[in-house]
Amino acid sequence: MLTSFELVLIKGHKDTLAKSGKSYDTITLAEIAQMAEVPNRLCKLDAPALIASTYNAPDARSHAAQREHGCFHAFVLDVDEGNTSLKQLNQALSAICGDCARIVYATSSATADAPKWRAIIPFKSPVTGQEYEQLQQALFASLAAHNITCDQAMKGAAQMSFLPNVPPDKRGEDGAPKYYEY
């Protein structure tokens, strides 16, 4: 079951509210799950992204601010190397995390010959920004024991992670994704 807490939503890689005094919009895991079923059709850098924290103040994209104020509700990982299949990733996550809820989807740069994955795995209880970075490191080490390499940048408390998206150049003439799994 996907709970209803609201995570930081970033509208494209240039979206910054640091000097605006405004808070970032938010998104729920249920909304992300719906997006995984019908991914966005945007150029990668214009696509929405998330930070797995509920701290959405104007400085939410700062690692220091998220470490200090962040309340994190999910692991987020990127698997960009190693030709890992969706089945292999799900088996490894089940071995490590048990029968847990998760959203796993192909990234915007994935192809059938070079699959790449993003996974969002909710916690039972929220953790601080410092705890989040430590837990991310532990999960990545556990996945490495299953021969799955995670993008180490995702350990950062304010690291944004793109949401489900298949850009126009990765779609056929009919608009359907050339490759997308979730």
Q: At which residue positions do the language-model features occur?
A:
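Short, conserved secondary-structure transition motifs
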Residues: 110-112, 127, 149-180
